[in-house]
C-alpha cells in the first residue's frame, strides 16, 4: 500500500487556524503532496512563518476575504471543532459561497488513505508515544509519513510526508472525531475521565474508545497498556469481541488473564534525566535492556508501546531500541528550556491531574537522585470546566512538589465560571508551600527569587504558561551571582 494521487477536493485548501499544532501538520503534508494551501491565524507564530516558507499564503486575523488568497479560491475550507467558532467570518463566507467546510480529522483520514496506518490514542501520553514510534521506525529504515500533536526535537517538525507505506498519527479523542479514521493498528495508552464538557459522562467518554477499536479491520491490531484500569478493561472487552489484542505493561501473562501480553516492563531506574529499563518481549527467552533519554516510568511504558508496535509490523527490535535510546523528546513534553548554574528549567504540557502527578513524580525522582535541591512547579490550570471538575485532584497532584506556584486559569475557548480561579486549587493544596500568582507579569521574578541552587523548576499547563520558562531563566541569570555553591546547607 501507498498513497495515491492527492484527492481532487484537496488540491486547493484554505485552513482556518492554520498555525495550530494539529492544523499546521496537515498543512505541511498537503504542501508536500502538491496542494495549494492558504490559511489564517489570530497571530504570527513560528508555525505560521514555517508554513509561509514552504509556500502557504497566510493571513493574520480572520476575514472573509482570506478565501481569495488562492487564485480561483479554495476547493475546501478546513477547520477544527475546538478552537474555531461557527461565526468565524471565513466559515460564514465559505457557507455563503457554497464551499465545503471539512473538519481536520476528515482531511487527515483522506491523507492516510492507502497507507498502513498506525494510530495512538488515550487520555495521556499520545504525543510522546506517537513520537517515540516515529523515531524508532525512522531508525529502522522506514520513512513514515506522520502527523503528531507536538514538534519532534529530532525532526524539528510535527508532520512529514514520507516515502514509505506507513503513516503514524495521533488520534485525538477529545470530541469523538477519531471515529473518522480507519487504522490498521491502534495503541491505547490509558483511559480515564476527561473532556466531560463534550461527552457529559465518564461512560460516554470511555465508549468512544470501544467504538474506535471496532474500526479495526479483520487484520487489525489493538495494542493496549494493561497497567491502566480503563485501558485494560477495553482490552478485555475487545478480546472478547474477537479483536486481535496485544497488551503491554508490568503484568505478566498470568496476571493479564486471556489478553495476550506482547511486552512486559520488568524494571526501570532513573539515570539523570533519562532511564534504563528491562523489558521482556513475548516469545523471547531473555529480557532486553531499553535505554531512554527521557525520565519517568510513564515514558518507559510509552517506549514499550513503541517497541511492541514496531515489532508487530516487522521492524528489528535491536534497531528499535537503538532508535529509542536516541529519542530527544517532544517540544513541551519535559522540554529543557534552560539552565543557570545548577538550576534547570523545564516545560511540560501536562494539564490533567494524572499528567501533573506523573510528571512531578519523575521530577521528584530526578531531584532525589542528585541528592540536593527541590522540585518547583509553576502550574497554570487549563479550562474553567476542567478546573472546577478536578480542583481537588490537581491539588493532590501538585502537593508532590516541594514548592508550588499556581497561576490563574487559562480559559482558552471557555467563558469564565463564577468562583472558578486558580485559588480554587491553591486552597486545597496541603503539605507543600504554595503561592497564588494571578498576575503573569510577576511570575518570573517571584519564582526566581524563591529558587535555590540544585532546584529543578518546571512550568506546566496547556496555555501560555509555556512563555514563562524563558522569562524564569532570564530572571535566574540576573541573580545567579548571589547564590551559594550547589548543595551548600541543603
From Swiss-Prot:
Pfam families: Mur_ligase (PF01225), Mur_ligase_C (PF02875), Mur_ligase_M (PF08245)
Pathway terms, separated by semicolons: Cell wall biogenesis; peptidoglycan biosynthesis
EC number(s) stated in the UniProt entry for this protein: 6.3.2.8
Top-level taxon: Bacteria
List of residues binding ATP: 122-128
InterPro entries for the chain: Mur-like_cat_sf, Mur_ligase_C, Mur_ligase_C_dom_sf, Mur_ligase_cen, Mur_ligase_N, MurCDEF_pg_biosynth, UDP-N-AcMur_Ala_ligase_MurC
Catalysed reaction, written as an equation: UDP-N-acetyl-alpha-D-muramate + L-alanine + ATP = UDP-N-acetyl-alpha-D-muramoyl-L-alanine + ADP + phosphate + H(+)
One MF annotation (Gene Ontology) recorded for this entry: UDP-N-acetylmuramate-L-alanine ligase activity
Keywords for this protein: ATP-binding, Cell cycle, Cell division, Cell shape, Cell wall biogenesis/degradation, Cytoplasm, Ligase, Nucleotide-binding, Peptidoglycan synthesis
Chief place where the protein resides: cytoplasm
One GO cellular component term noted in the UniProt record for this chain: cytoplasm
Subcellular location: Cytoplasm
Class of the enzyme per the UniProt entry, highest EC level: ligase
Alphabetical GO biological process terms: cell division; cell wall organization; peptidoglycan biosynthetic process; regulation of cell shape
Biological role stated in the UniProt entry: Cell wall formation.
Annotated family: Belongs to the MurCDEF family.
Protein name from the UniProt record: UDP-N-acetylmuramate--L-alanine ligase
Organism of derivation: Mycobacteroides abscessus (strain ATCC 19977 / DSM 44196 / CCUG 20993 / CIP 104536 / JCM 13569 / NCTC 13031 / TMC 1543 / L948)
